[in-house]
């Protein structure tokens, strides 16, 4: 967690110096995965290490004080995220992140990144340039002002709305947020927007180490993923997916795809006990010719 918060603050400084939204993308991805994944649900402590596969567990105690550096440094990540959430300078205002919030001149309503939209309501009057960070992963973002769709929205940029604002003007942002596969070596992982997805032993849906069959490509969208109701309050997001899992091709039953469940990485393993196992990278089937 100490490294996570330091990385977030480093990206914050780079964002302020360069104005490049890719650093806001990095803060966002870190915040919703490694950072929130390290935080215990009751807010009492931050985990020292957040592995991509394994368990969540307590950090070491320093100097017999029943706390550690990660729990001490952890709150700085919230300060970084909130400090860069909304910025106003001169004749422009910038939204770097999306969540329900009340800021100077605007209200935002959103369950992002659980949902793929944000709604911004104006409480200001007069000319102002409103800048919206468009994440690099959102290939086809739609922005509307008072119901009218605006021009081309380029991924990985700031979209500027130069407007003479009136009380009650509404901006709607719709992100392109499919589940995407990422391959590395003979392994595959899945993301949805800025969020890494994981399988969790609490779903009780089979062997988490079972390999995926060949054929999944890097950057491939995965249309069989669907958002479902979370099984308990321990999960923030949940998805079902019908996927080619298992290597028993010669068996007609084994050749069928399997339906399994995923959650967001921050929720994975958050029971904080040894029996709660999760996994984000999955083995991909391969042979001696590869």
Residues of each region from the PLM?
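Surface-exposed beta-strand/loop patches in extracellular or lumenal glycoproteins
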Residues: 126-135
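Surface-exposed, short loops/turns at beta-strand junctions within beta-sandwich domains
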Residues: 165-167
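Short, well-ordered beta-strand elements within core beta-sheets of diverse protein domains
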Residues: 12-16, 118-122, 160-161
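Structural helix-adjacent loops and short alpha-helical linkers that scaffold large soluble proteins
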Residues: 15-25
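Solvent-exposed beta-strand/loop surfaces of large extracellular or lumenal domains
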Residues: 138-163, 181-185
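C-terminal beta-rich recognition modules with glycine/proline-rich loops and embedded aromatic residues
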Residues: 24-33, 38-123, 154, 174-290
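Well-ordered alpha-helical segments within folded domains of soluble proteins
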Residues: 1-15, 71-81
């Amino acid at each position: 967690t100490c490294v996570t918060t330091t990385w977030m603050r480093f990206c914050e400084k780079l964002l302020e110096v360069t104005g490049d939204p890719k650093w806001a993308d990095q803060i966002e991805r870190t915040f919703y995965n490694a950072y929130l994944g390290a935080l215990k649900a009751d807010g009492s402590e931050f985990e020292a290490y957040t592995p991509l596969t394994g368990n969540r567990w307590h950090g070491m105690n320093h100097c017999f004080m029943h706390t550690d550096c990660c729990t001490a440094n952890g709150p700085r990540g919230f300060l970084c995220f909130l400090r860069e959430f909304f910025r106003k300078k001169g004749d422009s205002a910038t939204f770097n992140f999306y969540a329900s919030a009340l800021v100077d001149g605007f209200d935002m309503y959103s369950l992002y990144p659980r949902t793929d939209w944000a709604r911004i309501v104006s409480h200001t009057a007069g000319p102002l340039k409103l800048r919206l960070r468009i994440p690099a992963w959102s290939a086809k973002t739609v922005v509307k002002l008072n119901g009218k769709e605006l021009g081309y929205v380029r991924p990985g940029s700031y979209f500027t709305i130069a407007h003479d604002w009136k009380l009650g003007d509404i901006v709607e942002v719709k992100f392109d947020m499919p589940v995407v596969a990422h391959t590395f070596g003979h392994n595959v992982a899945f993301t949805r927007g800025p969020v890494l997805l994981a399988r969790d032993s609490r779903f009780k849906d089979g062997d988490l180490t079972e390999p995926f069959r060949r054929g999944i490509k890097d950057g491939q969208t995965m249309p069989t993923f669907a958002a479902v109701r979370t099984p308990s309050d321990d999960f923030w997001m949940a998805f079902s997916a019908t996927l080619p899992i298992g290597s028993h091709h010669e068996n007609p039953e084994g050749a069928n795809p399997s339906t399994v469940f995923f959650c967001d990485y921050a929720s994975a393993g958050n029971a904080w006990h040894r029996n709660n196992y999760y996994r984000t990278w999955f083995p991909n089937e391969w042979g001696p010719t590869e």
